[in-house]
Amino acid sequence: MANRREFLRECAGAAGLLFTGSAFGYAAPAGLQTAPPGKRWEVMVGGQRVRTIDLHTHVFAPEAAALLKDRSVEMLGHRVVQFESEETLRNLSVYNSEVRLASMNQRGIDMAVLSVNPLIYWPDPGLARQVSQITHEKLAALCAKHPDRLMGLGWVPLQHPALAAEVLEECVRKHKFPGVAVGGVVNKPGVAFEPLYELSDRALDPFWAKAEELGALVTIHPQKWIHPRWNEENGFDNIIGHPLEEALALSHLIFHGTLDRFPKLKILIVHAGGYLPAYVSRSDRYATGLSRNRPKRLPSEYLKELYYDALTFSNEGLRHLIAEVGLSQVVLGTDHGGGPATNRGWSHGAVDLILNAPFLSDADRRAILNGNATRLLRLET
């Protein structure tokens, strides 16, 4: 393992960040458009160059990983290790920024918004402060090195709500990040399926209030799922667990009043919003029959005020998402650096899907690839 360790250490030193997942450096699946190695795919729509913005990518700082290694929790008999030396070697790919930019060039991505992942909610306040500080310093330095290609979303310790609000403000004011990424639930350390906080919990109101005050983007991304009926071998933790957690998180925010208490929040839900947009009519029908805890509006109306990436993997999935939430709420997302470790082409094809969807006009394509994200991130046009 010595040579591999040396390679990882060298890359980490050059990058200052871990790019998580397995999606780097692999050839695209057959039939998808990419640039030749060393070249840049410049996406064109209707004869005009479009600066594509990817709002769903992953990153983590190795220095933060070092603080967390050898620490784990037990869930349903599984040892869940966010960062531990051997796990890191097996499950994390480390690349310097030049490798990432080359991969972006090949996939037709001009700007990537890097979200910190995995999302960890078990550290005590002191360790959480250390993790956030070093993560954000490294992320800010990387983005400053490539300001026209990379932006960052911070990590906040939601298990400590007051500290989370404080860290959020630092992310926006000090590091100039447009916002942060959060999980779909804050679980109790070592306890599966027993939340410390749902995102709608009143204890998190200081965080949501600060996000609304700052106009910060809050991206919701699932955490690792452990369940006796699925595991990493069959992929159900990802393909079922992730969209399910997103549907639950959104439902809590809607039915428990968070979106009413903070109506100006800017929330992006990755993976096309999970299962809820696909079957929100069921939630609408249920809500109309409630006598207590009834949302002020139909759930489908709240969905139209949130944002979603277009990572649906099919024309019909994208068409239905747009029909439910509106074209103005959909942005490009690739899950670059994430996705199942067994699926090497997971994040390829996101741009192709938008370019080739037969129901989209050129104006629609430009909106999803650039315009909606430009507005959401408050970028200069």
PLM features: what roles do these ranges have?
Residues 49, 61-94, 225-244, 283-305:
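Active-site gating loops and adjacent loop-to-helix segments of metal-dependent hydrolytic enzymes
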Residues 110-249:
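Active-site gating/metal-coordination segments in enzymes
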Residues 225-226, 273-277, 314:
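Short, catalytically relevant binding-site loops at active-site mouths
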